[in-house]
Every structure is written in C-alpha cells, then in structure tokens.
Swiss-Prot record:
Similarity comment: family membership: Belongs to the PPP phosphatase family. BSU subfamily.
Location (main, coarse): nucleus
GO cellular component labels: nucleus
Record-level GO BP terms: brassinosteroid mediated signaling pathway
Cited InterPro entries: Calcineurin-like_PHP_ApaH, Kelch-typ_b-propeller, Kelch_1, Metallo-depent_PP-like, MPP_BSL_C, Ser/Thr-sp_prot-phosphatase, Ser/Thr_prot_Pase_BSU1
Region (Disordered): 381-402, 430-466, 499-525, 861-883
Kelch repeat residue intervals: 64-113, 221-271, 273-323, 341-387
Keywords: Hydrolase, Kelch repeat, Manganese, Metal-binding, Nucleus, Protein phosphatase, Repeat
Protein name, UniProt field: Serine/threonine-protein phosphatase BSL1 homolog
Length: 883
C-alpha cells in the first residue's frame, strides 16, 4: 500500500440526496427498517440491475442497560424487497421454497443473479450459520439452502461477508453471543463439496470487532473498515485482505487518516473508492459533521471527506454541517452501488427508525474536481456459459440442496468468467437445452424498434451511387524470410482472397486466475508521454526487451492515464472524424505487429505521416499477446501528443472482468511486481471506462468494435451512452456494440444465438442493410473477430471486419490488416503476413522462447478454437472459447 503524493488527483466524498420519483406503495415498500442488508444483483433477461433488501428490524426499543435504542427482536422480519434501478420501483417478492428465519445484523453477498445470506439474530436468538441462497435467475424467485460440509464460522451476528475475487465467500469478525470475534473464513464456490476454511493470513491482522463492514474491490481485495471492539470502543482502522498467487492470504493495514472511528456504518466500493457513510461512536452517539460521509481512495491511499483529503481527525462543529452530512447522521442502514451511484436505505437516527432512500452520484461530470481515481471498475457480475438452472425442480430437501450447490458454483463461475455481463439468463440443465432456450428468445426477424422509424424521405437507396468504395486491390507485405527486412510488397486482387470468410475465435475453458491485488498510488513529471514515444515508437528497430521488467513504474502509469483520461473525457461517445484516416483492428498486445504495420505503411509522427492522415484504433489493445503494456502505453502517449489525429475507441477486452482472465493482469503483475502491477492494471481499467465507443468517418462510415446486435438501430442510441460506463450499467446496447458479430455468411439473415455465450447474438446482412439505410450510412467497419486475411467483407460489402494482429494466439496463422480510407472515401486494405518461425537465430531465440511460453500457458488456460467452418468440440461449447 502506498500513500498519495502531493497533487494526487482525488475527489472529495459525494453529496447524498433523496431518490426522486421512486414507487412502491403499501406492502411493496420496505418501510421503516434497520439492521437489514442491501445487495446489488446482476441484470437478468427481464430486468436491469436490482437492489435486494432483506430482513432487518421494523421496530425499536430502548436498551435496558445502555439507555440507547436497540432493535426489537420481535419486530425482526425475513421479508424480501426488490428495487428495479431502471424503473425506480420497489416490489415485495414472495420467493418459493423455505425461507431463512427472520433476522437482522446478518451478512449478505451477491453471486451473479443470486444473493447469499448467512448468520444474524432474530426472535429465536442467533440464526444458524447455514447459507441461504435467494435465486433471482430467469425472474423465478426461489429460496435454497446450501449444504456445506465440515466445521464453519458458526452462528454469529454483526459480522460481514462478501464475494472475493469472484470466487471466495469470505466472512470476517462478528459476535457469537459469547465474545467478539477476529477470525476470517472462506468458502471456495468453485470447489465441491463446499467447505468453509478458516484462514490464517499473514501480515497485520485486525483486532476482534463487530459491526464492521467488509467490501470486495473488483480486482479481489476485501477491505475491512471500522467496527466496535470487545470494550465497546469504535475503531477507525481499515485493513485489506488479499490472496497471493501462492494461495496464501494476507492482511495489510490501509494508509491514511480516517475522518472518524465508527461502527454500525455502511460501506461500498465504486471503482477503487470505498464509500463509507454514517455510523456511531461509543455510547451510540451518531457521527456528525463531515465525518458522516467519507471515502477511502485505495488507489491514492488517502481518506477523504466532503472537503477533500483528511489530514487529521477533527470533526466539524454542527454549524458546519451541510445537508448531505445531516442526511447521513444514522446507523444500522445499508448501502449498495450500481455503476457510479451509491444507494442507501433506512437505518436509525437516535430513537427514530428511518424509511428514506438516498443516492449519491460519483460521476466525474457532476464533480467540480478532476480525478483519475474514482470511476468504477466494472464489477465482475458477468455471465457464465455453463450457468444452467432449473427453477421448477422438486422442492425436496435433497434435490433442493444439490441443485442449490450446483447453482452457486455456476453463479460464481459466471462472475469469474465475466463474459455476458448484462445477459446471463438461466438455462436448462443440459447444454442442448441451453442453446434451445436461447434460440426461443431470439427470432429470425430483426427486432427493429418501433420507436425508431425510418426517415420518411429516405428511399431504397438502389438508385444512389455510393461514395464509399473498397479498392479492387489490396496492398500486401509478403512473409518475410529470416533476416530479410526488406519485405516484398505486392498488390492482390480482392478476388484472390480465398480465406475471406474464414473467421476465427479464441477460446478458453472456465478456469480463472487467482486473485492478486494491493493498494497503491501514483504521480510523475510532465512530458512523460514524450518519454514513452521516444522509447517505444521504433517501427524498424524495436525488439522485445530481453528483461521483462516494464520501463514505467505505477507512478508514471498513473500520470499517463490521467493525462489521456482528461482528453477522452472531453470527447463525444461517437467521434466525428474526417478522411484520410487509417483504421486498425484488434492488436491484442502484439506490439511487434503494430511496429510492422507502422514500418510498412507509415507511423504517427512528424517524421512519418501524421501531418496528413489520422489514425483510428478499434479496441482490444490488451490481452493474449505478450506486450499489452507497450501497446496501450504507446497508444495513450500518441493520443496525448496528437489528440486531434490519433483516436481510440473501446473494445470488449477493455474491461477488468475480461482482461483479468486473458493475460493483461498477469502481464502487469509479472512485469511490474504484484503491488504496482495490480494498481497499474486497475488504473488502466478505470481509464478504459472513458474511451469513446464508436466513430463516424465523413458521416458515411461508422466504426465500432463489435456490431449492431439486436438492439442498435440508430447512431443516437450509441451517442446517448454516458461515460464513464461499465458493462453492468451499459445494458444491451453496450453489450451488442462490443460483443456482437455478423452471422456466418450473407445467406444467414436475422438474428441468431452467438457461440460466444448466452444472451449474445449474431446479426445478418438484412440487419446491416436496414441499419445503414436508417442512418444514411454506406459502410460499417468493425473488429472483434479474427479473420484469415486480416479483413473480410459481409452484407454485400456494407460491412468489413478488420483484424490487425497476425498469427493470433500463436496458432491461427492469419494475416493482419489495416484499412486506409482516402479523401475520396476509397478504402485500400493493407496487409502483413505472420512472421515465419526463426531458424537458429541466437538474437531472437530468447525472446521468441518467451513468446512461445507465454502463448502456450495462456492457450492452455484459454485454448484457441479451430478456424471458421471447422466443427467445434462439445467441451468448448460452453467455455470462454470465443472471447
């Protein structure tokens, strides 16, 4: 963990306000409540993200011994209420199955579209330590009790629990009725039979406490904050719990000075910022003033209140309160975050039970400060291709327990795999029925929105002469002989590209890397981007470094990301660009290919061609290849140097829950060290949330990473997506934009299920024609899929797929290509072929051996699939084979 240097970019804690316009009358509204839980569940097919409120007390009474109000156990409930973030409506749920007993002061954690509950206290005393699962999948609500073998944490209340590293349910501290506890337990949701494991972490262990909070950061660190010790003293410390690659857990004391000690507070992560609200001091006195709202910025290593960085624990007097601080003068409330918004419900203020509903928005546009540290890293609440449920199964204990175990495993795997973030729908038990159920939800007709009518004055377009034309010949750099860097350049007729329809997809199984994370910081001198360009932009002379250590430290990565982020924040979601321009497809960390393309066809420098042609990159800068760090840092540096000429949009791998699995996080750790590497990886992913999502060239060509899918009918739909944006708040439009693909060929029309996973689609040529006609476009350029010749035409030439990395995953043997769009909108493909393997080349053998090892290890984890048209093995059908 580090501390922030001077001038660190931090944003004060946000202001809270009451949620406006929410609905929920009568029994649907949770009403007065304290000691409850509030948990965010991933979107389902029929709903967007939802908040699940469970349990808690509906009445209070004066404490006999303390004179302070406490919960009335007779008023404790087990009711379940759901708040739909999109519709702003509260609904009381009545799930099938045997519910847990009424309880308060329990612990809850989300696993995909399920919520796990454990412990608590109610009218019957301490609740058991059984795990109860509320399954919301497929919008069929049902309770399940999960069977766990062996000893566990035991009955307790006032403890905390969260899902760590998208895999481990970790519960910490609490009170078992006899003593205050300091232990930590973990349950691996990917291993059956389920067993609790008592952890023995290294490092600075936190003292025994209850009424603390524990929140998991997206990259897998659990942050324990505050609490009350055995003597009743409130605590002000915070500890990070993380698991190293060896499997050993470690506690680390968080830096900084917290605004106040506290317990019975609420805390939730938004990106790298832990938002802490409310709580009480010794004797139950509510925290007042600025201390009622706090943020621990784990990236900058500082605590903040409403005024900025906290340097000493001096609470303001009551006349300094702002309205937001007064609202948060409460305890026993609950909080959850959706995107950049933090929601709070209920609680206790003195002897007054609350039923209000609050929200704060951490979006940078609403802040008068600029910060690089606070936008949200996407939650790994994404979807599992193997995630199959049968909600109509018999309710006998044996079958329920078995199915609930399977469901919990599959849900946690869904988090770890993180592929279909918005559209994980529950499938039937078999792979075949999974495909069938998806097919039933996707018809062959294109679901064009009735609210987006075609322009009345637009005719069929058959009589119009198109302005955009694909040149009849492509420029090709032939395969290079060893030692021959001259490169034979030739032109081929497009008719000679026999492999043009051979699209290919990388694959994987459902394994995931162990969690590795830390707290850290950043900052660096001015002009850093020039250093990066000078060091990396060597099109003819670049060689992979013999030493794997990266030449920038996390301090400099933070500076680079901040400078680029300020530019991206000022750009529209859909860029408006002019020709001439070069368009690049997926690079996937293959920095050598980027240098070859620059060398052969010009590079962005005043010594190159930047003075008369722009550059557009279509995303997927990281993962798979061995030099993702070089690729993304150079592109960011070029963006800073030439902000009006170099353009970057987002790909599906520019998301933490994807690039945690496919090499980028591992590369950061291996080349920068674990602490600096995880911090840098997190910082890059924060920046990715600001990237533009599409680009228009001369208002006639639209460029995107994935496609139009089933939901995108107008460019305005893309323009309305507000950044920073994460997969879980972007919904179907963002998912289609980054993930959808064309169908197999022009003969397959409409929509079809996409082999990449549940909820993802392929779109036919009819969709392309309708979209272009509706938006007065002549061409779609997209990336996302490996194609044998580096580019591929679809929909009678109205769509081109572009891929710039050669020999993808070290096995594809595909060419890489760029498209050069001239002033007359004539498009010329320019290709490079894969380099042949070296023949006893001592100079290149060590680095190529490293390349081979890197590819082999990653391909074992995520094996590439056969080329387009070859049969797919049954074992791969529900894997990550297609990311």
């Amino acid at each position: 963990m580090g501390t922030a240097g001077k001038g660190a970019w931090v944003v004060p804690a946000p202001a809270y306000r009451e949620v406006e316009g929410w609905e929920g009358a009568g029994d649907d509204s949770p009403g007065f409540r304290c000691g409850h839980s509030l948990t965010v569940v991933a979107p389902t097919k029929g709903h967007g993200p939802r908040l699940i409120l469970f349990g808690g007390a509906t009445a209070i009474e004066a404490g006999a011994s303390s004179g302070m109000p406490g919960i009335r156990l007779a008023g404790v409930t087990n009711s379940v209420h759901s708040y739909d973030v999109d519709t702003r409506r509260w609904t009381r749920l009545h799930p099938a199955g045997e519910p847990p007993s009424p309880r308060a002061a329990h612990a809850a954690a989300a696993v995909g579209t399920m919520v796990v509950f454990q412990g608590g206290i109610g009218p019957a005393g301490h609740s058991t330590d059984d795990l109860y699962v509320l399954d919301l999948t497929n919008d069929k609500f049902k309770w399940h009790r999960v069977v766990v073998q062996g000893a566990g944490p035991g009955p307790r209340y006032g403890h905390c629990m969260d899902l760590v590293a998208q895999r481990y349910l970790v519960t910490v501290s609490g009170n078992d009725g006899k003593r205050v506890l300091s232990d930590a337990w973990a349950l691996d949701t990917a291993q059956k039979p389920y067993r609790w494991q008592k952890l023995n972490p290294d490092g600075d262990r936190p003292s025994a406490r209850m009424y603390a909070t524990a929140s998991a950061r997206t990259d897998g660190m659990l942050l324990l904050c505050g609490g009350r010790d055995a003597s009743g003293m409130p605590l002000s410390d915070a500890y990070g719990l993380l698991m190293h690659t060896s499997g050993q857990w470690e506690w680390t004391l968080a830096p900084g000075v917290s605004p106040s000690p506290r317990y019975q507070h609420a805390a939730v992560f938004v990106g790298a910022r832990l938002h802490v609200t409310g709580g009480v001091l010794r004797g139950g006195r509510a925290i007042e003033g600025e201390g009622a709202i706090a943020v621990l910025d784990t990236a900058a290593g500082v605590w903040l209140d409403r005024n900025g960085i906290v340097t000493s624990r001096t609470l303001k007097s009551s006349h300094d309160h702002d309205a937001s601080s007064d609202l948060l003068r409460r305890c026993r409330h609950a909080a959850a975050s959706v995107g950049t918004q933090i929601y709070i419900y209920g609680g206790l203020r003195g002897d007054i039970l609350l039923d209000d509903f609050l929200v704060a928005d951490n979006a940078p546009i609403q802040s008068e400060f600029t910060s690089s540290m606070y936008d949200r890293v996407p939650r790994a609440e994404n979807q599992n291709r193997n995630h199959n449920f049968n909600s109509d199964s018999p309710t006998t204990n044996n079958s329920t327990d078995k199915k609930s175990i399977d469901m919990l495993t599959q849900a946690s795997a869904a988090e770890a795999e993180a592929v279909s973030a918005v559209w994980r729908a529950a499938q039937e038990a078999s792979h075949a029925s999974s495909e069938d159920s998806l097919s039933e939800g996707i018809g062959s007709e294109s679901p064009l929105s009735e609210t987006s009518p075609m322009p009345e004055d637009l005719d069929d377009g058959g009589s119009l002469e198109p302005d955009v034309k694909l040149h009849s010949r492509a420029v090709v750099v032939s395969k290079e002989a060893v030692g021959d860097l001259g490169c034979l350049v030739r032109q081929l007729s497009l008719d000679q590209f026999e492999n043009e329809s051979r699209r290919m997809h990388p694959s994987s199984n459902d394994q995931s890397y162990p969690a590795k994370k830390a707290l850290n910081r950043q900052r660096s001198p001015q002009g850093l981007h020039k250093k990066v360009i000078s060091f990396l932009l060597k099109p003819r002379n670049w060689r992979a470094p013999a030493e794997r250590a990266f030449f920038l430290d996390s301090y400099e990565v933070g500076e680079l990301c901040y400078a680029a982020e300020q530019i991206f924040m000022q750009e529209p979601t859909v860029l408006q660009l002019k020709a001439p321009i070069k368009v690049f497809g997926d690079l996937h960390g293959q920095f050598g290919d980027l240098m070859r393309l620059f060398d052969e066809y010009g590079y962005p420098s005043t010594a190159g061609d930047i003075t008369y042609i722009d550059y557009l990159f279509l995303g997927d800068y990281v993962d798979r290849g061995q030099h993702s760090l070089e690729t993304i840092t150079l592109l960011l540096a070029l963006k800073i140097e030439y902000p009006e000429n170099v353009h970057l949009i987002r790909g599906n791998h520019e998301a933490a829950d994807i690039n945690a699995l496919f090499g980028f996080r591992l590369e950061c750790i291996e080349r920068m060290g674990e602490s600096d590497g995880i911090w840098a990886w997190t910082r890059f992913n924060q920046l990715f949330n600001y990237l533009p999502l599409a680009a228009m060239i001369e208002k006639k060509i639209i460029c995107m990473h994935g496609g139009i899918g089933r939901s995108i009918n107008t460019i305005e739909q893309i323009e309305k997506l507000e950044r920073p944006i994460t997969m879980d708040v972007g919904s179907i439009i963002l998912m289609d934009l980054l993930w959808s693909d064309p169908t197999e060929n022009d003969s397959v029309e409409g929509l079809r299920p996409n082999a990449r996973g549940p909820g993802l689609v392929t779109f036919g040529p009819d969709r392309v024609t309708e979209f272009c006609k509706r938006n007065r476009l002549q061409l779609i350029i997209r990336a996302h899929e490996c194609v044998m010749d580096g580019f591929e035409r679809f929909a009678h030439g109205q769509l081109i797929t572009l891929f710039s990395a050669t020999n993808y995953c070290g096995t594809a043997n595909n060419a890489g290509a760029i498209l050069v769009v001239g002033r007359g909108l004539v498009i010329v493909p320019k290709l490079i072929h894969p380099l042949p393997p070296p023949v006893n080349s001592p100079e290149s053998s060590p680095e190529r051996a490293m390349d081979a090892t890197w590819m082999q290890e990653l391909n074992i984890q995520r094996p590439p699939t056969p080329t387009r048209g070859r049969p797919q093995s049954a074992s791969d059908r529900n894997s990550l084979a297609y990311i």
